[in-house]
Amino acid sequence: MDPCECAKTGTCNCGATCKCTNCQCTTCKKSCCSCCPSGCSKCASGCVCKGNSCGSSCCQ
């Protein structure tokens, strides 16, 4: 179980280099935050941020 959690909205930090702001996320992965880009209603399963943001390819 990953020790990271984040609110439905807000800022999510996982590890030293990952920071996702205003992500619609409910859990963090150790590598980064599981989140959707703005305007994305649903993320693909297993989508993770690369750097500080997710690409539109995460959207379903």
Swiss-Prot record:
This is Metallothionein-2. The keyword Metal-binding applies. It comes from Danio rerio (Zebrafish). Belongs to the metallothionein superfamily. Type 1 family. GO terms for molecular function: metal ion binding. A divalent metal cation 5 binds at residues 33, 35-36, 49. One of its GO terms (biological process) is response to methylmercury. The gene is mt2. It comes from the Eukaryota. Signal peptide: none annotated. A divalent metal cation 7 binds at residues 49, 54, 58-59. A divalent metal cation 4 binds at residues 32-33, 43, 47. Class I metallothioneins contain 2 metal-binding domains: four divalent ions are chelated within cluster A of the alpha domain and are coordinated via cysteinyl thiolate bridges to 11 cysteine ligands. Cluster B, the corresponding region within the beta domain, can ligate three divalent ions to 9 cysteines. Residues 1-28 are annotated as: Beta.
